[in-house]
Amino acid sequence: MINRRQLLQGGAATILTASVVGVSSKETPQLEIIDTNLSLFQWPFRRLPLDDTGLLIKKMRALGITQGWAGSLEAILHRDLSSVNRRLVEVCSHHPELTPIGSINPTLPDWQGDLSRCSKKFKMPGIRLHPSYHGYTLSDRFFAQILEQATKAGLFVQVAITMEDLRTQHSRMRVPDVDLTPLPRVMRNHPGARVQILNLRPKAAQIDLLAKIHGVYLDTSRVEGTDGVPALLGKMPAGSVLFGTHAPLLIPEAALIRTHESSILDEKDLCALFVGNAQAFLGA
């Protein structure tokens, strides 16, 4: 069995594939990895090792991550999200590995225009929401309106449940996790919507709730334990779990290590988790 050092020094995608098919990494074509949960720029409350885009790209390449869906950390506190999204697109245009995911704050004027620009001007595949930071809940009319307009525009919607652990949050800005309880009702009213929940630390009751909702997907960034990812795959509908790291707020190696050290996923499972499910989500 390969160890962590081999995994992280040898190119994660190639090493992971070789380990499950039982051949040497030299004989194995590199497995694609799509990271559905990246962010660019600086976190407002502290510097992070990978908050420089060049360093983040270098780390992605070292780990074999071939594509990253990137939101903007500027969206947390900035009010001019049109400019935030424009800067994101400009930076991503210089890095073919990055796919920009626009940010929408429905409590601000002209959020409908921001959503339209994400779709029509910037040709983004999806948008990202931060309800707790922007002051609304999933039961507010804003969320239903976003789902309706995003679905009409062919955009998926990512909902960041949290951005950092409560224990590390600034003492003057404690931000609770998003409450998922209203989600089943809202999704029933928007059957064509595609919603990916980001940064969820799955609990049994939450997974039981989410597994029953058509159109809901999860990422792996905060799944804990060496058996956490296989357990999540076993409880959620097929194709509904996508690989994500939550870099730069979390180190991307962590998500890869947890996936590898489960020693349960076979080649088919890995391919689906790393790339197939994300591709299907894009085309759904």
Segments predicted by a language model, with ranges:
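Active-site gating/metal-coordination segments in enzymes
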Residues: T66-Q67, A75, R79-V159, M163-D165
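Short beta->alpha connector loops
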Residues: E74, I104-P109, S132-Y133, L200-A204, ...
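Mid-to-C-terminal alpha-helical segments outside catalytic/metal-binding sites
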Residues: I2-T36, F45, P49-Q67, A238-S240, ...
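Catalytic pocket-lining loop regions of alpha/beta-barrel enzymes
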Residues: F122-G126, S139-L242
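A short acidic, helix-capping loop that chelates divalent metal ions and anchors anionic groups
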Residues: Q42-P44, I76, D165-H170
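Histidine-centered divalent metal-coordination motifs
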Residues: N37-F41, A160
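Active-site neighborhood of phospho(di)ester-bond hydrolases with catalytic His/Asp-centered motifs
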Residues: I34-T36, W69-G71, I101-S103, R128, ...
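Conserved, mostly hydrophobic/aromatic
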Residues: N37, M60, L88, A150, ...
